[in-house]
């Protein structure tokens, strides 16, 4: 999965992350050379690589399935059925087996569950698993 520095720049990246990426690429300004998201991951880390997904054309299905896999990697921590149901609906939607209306309803219910169970421990535990899944998504292995 690839983007370009010009596509990233259009979305106004944070100054620190932008300068770090340019430096690690040995560049001083944006260009249209294809840039692998895994290169951004190696340079700047998972948060910046995920942020750069907004600068990728297409691949909506892969991105949604990545989110599903990230959620599944920590679903053992989920105790609210609304969250588990939302994962299933998101996967079905990515595969063309659920409607936008079903997805919206599941999303709303899941946010209600998330607000009820908000906590940083689950997010921290998921970080490494998400980075590994991100690489698989970028390589087309999901």
Please report, for each region that a protein language model flagged, where it lies by residue.
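Short, glycine-biased loop/turn motifs at secondary-structure junctions and
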Residues: 1-142
């Amino acid at each position: 999965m690839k983007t370009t520095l010009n596509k990233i720049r259009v979305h106004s990246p944070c100054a620190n992350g932008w300068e770090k990426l340019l430096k690690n690429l040995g560049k001083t300004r944006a260009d249209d050379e294809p840039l692998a998201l895994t290169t951004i991951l190696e340079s700047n880390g998972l948060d910046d690589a995920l942020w750069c997904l907004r600068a990728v054309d297409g691949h909506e299905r892969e991105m949604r399935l990545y989110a599903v896999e990230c959620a599944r990697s920590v679903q053992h921590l989920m105790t609210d059925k609304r969250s588990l149901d939302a994962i299933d609906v998101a996967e079905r939607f990515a595969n063309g087996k659920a409607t936008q209306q079903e997805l919206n309803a599941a999303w709303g219910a899941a946010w209600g569950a998330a607000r009820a169970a908000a906590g940083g421990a689950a997010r921290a535990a998921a970080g490494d698993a998400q980075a590994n899944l991100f690489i698989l998504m970028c390589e087309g292995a999901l």
